[in-house]
Amino acid sequence: MKLTSLRVSLLALGLVTSGFAAAETYTVDRYQDDSEKGSLRWAIEQSNANSAQENQILIQAVGKAPYVIKVDKPLPPIKSSVKIIGTEWDKTGEFIAIDGSNYIKGEGEKACPGANPGQYGTNVRTMTLPGLVLQDVNGVTLKGLDVHRFCIGVLVNRSSNNLIQHNRISNNYGGAGVMITGDDGKGNPTSTTTNNNKVLDNVFIDNGDGLELTRGAAFNLIANNLFTSTKANPEPSQGIEILWGNDNAVVGNKFENYSDGLQINWGKRNYIAYNELTNNSLGFNLTGDGNIFDSNKVHGNRIGIAIRSEKDANARITLTKNQIWDNGKDIKRCEAGGSCVPNQRLGAIVFGVPALEHEGFVGSRGGGVVIEPAKLQKTCTQPNQQNCNAIPNQGIQAPKLTVSKKQLTVEVKGTPNQRYNVEFFGNRNASSSEAEQYLGSIVVVTDHQGLAKANWAPKVSMPSVTANVTDHLGATSELSSAVKMR
């Protein structure tokens, strides 16, 4: 025997005797919910028992569409690296549904209790009654599935490097369609456990929250998904909620028919770009520090971008090159977000919009949630006012525009001897005061009195023009008053 062959044989013998298990493929070709061979429950149990990387669970189309596996009790958590694939999607685009309605009983969101007694539904802390559970596991792929009628469709808890792609996530009325959370089990965030997950090319329909990034979820990518809600949704809250989630990227998604398209609660350094938000009460509903909103299309909402006051007076939110138009619609949808205050100031970018933590919020704060009036936050309305939050983004003032012979003059009033970036926007309607088309930018520097003035000539002719300003720390103002160019 050659020496090389001997070494290979000894290696193979060593792997066998050491208990090494090769990656396996488990085929699901029975839709009964039992532990017999061929069921989904059996396949998950088998994969969990095999410690090898990259097992596969291939779910076959059985019978005629729609293909539905109705589970009668919670499925076991996924504990091994595995690809769970509905095989029909690659062939016909059909999803294979995993449906929890056989054991999750009750009326809408009330069937989904929260972690605290008496609370229920989407807008409370919960990890109750999920469909597929990825807990303390890495390297899981979900594809070609419709995860349907659970309280949480997919729970990704303290897990990293997982991929959720080409699925439909539908009618999950508790926490979210997909919940990505670093929750330690007691409501506390964990900062390094829930990273680098990817949620791509999915359709989210009629979930309470479409997706959540909470309690330490960081460096995750959410891209090219549709988040939509219909009249069938009992609690249309947020397309995405980020709560104490940092450094995530949300790119190229569409959000429609929610209270908020996307809501950030005290998350930091998230990058939100190239999304479209329409027919929401609020397009963006924001707090947090270092978050950047770049080149989004925000139209047909009650308010385009709402920046809330918060206890951190130094928090800064950056808005750049966003296209904002046709807002001011009468959309009063307020499930832990949105805008239902009757006399609320409307527009493209509005500071100081009240949310559920604020005095003056009108709407639901979550099922069974009661906040003592003394604990509600207030937004300062007068200089030197006490016991209230400062105006967002340090109250940075919008620039002032004037026009003469189709040349704009911009005046900025700010901190002395500081750099400011001014962005200009055009509107096709002369009566519009929003930011339909990004036209360009200039940098100005204030003098010792905090004043700067500059001239700028747009290269594109638009009936009306607005501008906003961003300071060197990243805080962006509301829009200026519009000037007519014709």
From Swiss-Prot:
GO terms for molecular function: 3-dehydroshikimate dehydratase activity. One of its GO terms (biological process) is quinate metabolic process. Gene3D superfamilies: Single-stranded right-handed beta-helix, Pectin lyase-like. The keyword Nucleus does not apply. It catalyses: 3-dehydroshikimate = 3,4-dihydroxybenzoate + H2O. InterPro entries: NosD_dom, PbH1, Pectin_lyas_fold, Pectin_lyase_fold/virulence. Its EC number is 4.2.1.118. It is an enzyme of class 4 (lyase). Pathway: Aromatic compound metabolism; 3,4-dihydroxybenzoate biosynthesis; 3,4-dihydroxybenzoate from 3-dehydroquinate: step 2/2. It holds the Pfam family NosD. Keywords: Lyase, Quinate metabolism. It comes from the Bacteria. SMART domains: PbH1. The keyword Lyase applies. Converts dehydroshikimate to protocatechuate. This is 3-dehydroshikimate dehydratase. It comes from Acinetobacter baylyi (strain ATCC 33305 / BD413 / ADP1). The lineage of its organism: Bacteria, Pseudomonadati, Pseudomonadota, Gammaproteobacteria, Moraxellales. The gene is quiC.
